[in-house]
């Protein structure tokens, strides 16, 4: 498999950094719609036992930043959030992790970055996006499509579309990545 092309499609740029203030929903009807279409499916994914190498439920990248940034009170304290990002691109990661810890969450950072050796909250694991995406398999597709469609509708959000289509691209072109044993 040619992973170079995959990596190119998975790259994020500065414009894709999530801005929590931009994403906040203030209209109660919009909030209810979001909870039905996006938040509850995400919680269902967590409770269904999608586990990471540290035996933690996983929410990936900007979805984790978004959901946790607005709805941290919806997550019970015994649920851990494992954020998988390129920390040199997502400048929110460290501050976001500290916020999670403040509200009682255990946070692992799995990252490409090996230069921030003074940041004690990092877990130094060499992992790539393919491994991350394969761990989600097709169970993540419906959630990402809902996430994308909702924000295209409400905010014309290219960020949401770009994020969701990373996974959709891989599912269409490399379906073998999603045939991962549950064992």
Task: Indicate residue ranges for each PLM-predicted region.
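Helical scaffold of the NTase/Pol beta-like nucleotidyltransferase catalytic core
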Residues: 2-59
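Catalytic cores of NTP-dependent nucleotidyl/adenyl transfer enzymes across multiple folds
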Residues: 7, 13, 17-29, 116-183
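Metal-dependent nucleotidyltransferase catalytic core
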Residues: 29-43, 82-120
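Active-site nucleotide-donor binding segment shared across nucleotidyl transfer reactions
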Residues: 44-79, 84-89
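N-terminal cationic-hydrophobic initiation segments that often serve targeting/anchoring roles
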Residues: 47-51, 97-100, 171
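Generic preference for hydrophobic
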Residues: 59, 81, 109, 132-134
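Residues that form or immediately flank small-molecule/cofactor binding pockets and catalytic motifs
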Residues: 62-64, 112-114, 137-139
């Amino acid at each position: 498999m040619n992973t170079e092309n995959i990596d190119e499609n998975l790259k994020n740029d500065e414009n894709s950094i999530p801005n929590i203030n931009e994403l906040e929903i203030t209209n109660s009807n919009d909030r209810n719609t979001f909870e039905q279409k996006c938040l509850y499916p995400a919680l269902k994914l967590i409770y269904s036992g999608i586990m990471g190498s540290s035996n933690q439920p996983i929410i990936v990248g900007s979805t984790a930043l978004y959901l946790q940034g607005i709805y941290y009170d919806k997550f019970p304290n015994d649920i851990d959030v494992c954020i998988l990002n390129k920390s040199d691109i997502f400048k929110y990661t460290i501050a976001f992790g500290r916020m999670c810890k403040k509200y009682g969450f255990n946070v692992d950072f799995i990252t490409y970055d090996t230069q921030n050796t003074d940041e004690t909250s990092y877990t130094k694991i060499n992992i790539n996006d393919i491994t991350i995406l394969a761990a989600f398999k097709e169970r993540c597709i419906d959630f990402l499509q809902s996430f994308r469609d909702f924000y295209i509708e409400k905010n014309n959000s290219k960020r949401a579309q770009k994020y969701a289509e990373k996974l959709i691209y891989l599912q269409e072109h490399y379906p073998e990545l999603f045939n991962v044993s549950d064992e």
